[in-house]
Amino acid sequence: MSKKALKAAGFLAGTAAVAGAAAFTVTKILVDTALDRDMPRVMKNSDNLISGSGTDPEKIESALKKGDELEAMPHEDVEITAADGIKLKGHWYHKEGDKRVVIAMHGWRSSWKKDFGTCAEFFLENDCSVLFAEQRGQNSSGGDSMGFGLVE
């Protein structure tokens, strides 16, 4: 093999190594941001945003109040142990004479009462029993990372 071919092969190998390391690092950062229990520092200020409302304090306060009202309603706190031993929590609201059951999974880095406080009344008024699940790695459920319901 000529010197020129060796240099080209070395350059290509070095480039591939740098690209691989960069891809690994970026992927790790993105996965950690998406799945880790703790919210990244740069996202702390987004915690109180409600879709379409910006940071309107009245809307945020109203949604939080509805969440507190939902939590205060009669319900049963439930817990299961996943196949990997992690304890997962939920909140069962039974509607006598229900016609359907809703399993409600809160959004990314949120909570059941924050996401469903404003719409829970609709479910119950329409003859639904509802299980508000707490995602793995969030709130009272165990685990170090979110599973988005895929591993439960």
Q: Where does each model-flagged region fall?
A:
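A short loop-to-beta-strand scaffold at the N-terminal edge of the catalytic core in hydrolase folds
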Residues: 83-94
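Histidine-centered divalent metal-coordination motifs
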Residues: 89, 106-107, 138
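Serine-hydrolase catalytic-loop signature spanning alpha/beta hydrolases and amidase-signature enzymes
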Residues: 107-118, 130
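Catalytic nucleophile-loop/oxyanion-hole region of alpha/beta-hydrolase
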Residues: 112, 136-152
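Conserved alpha/beta-hydrolase
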Residues: 122-142
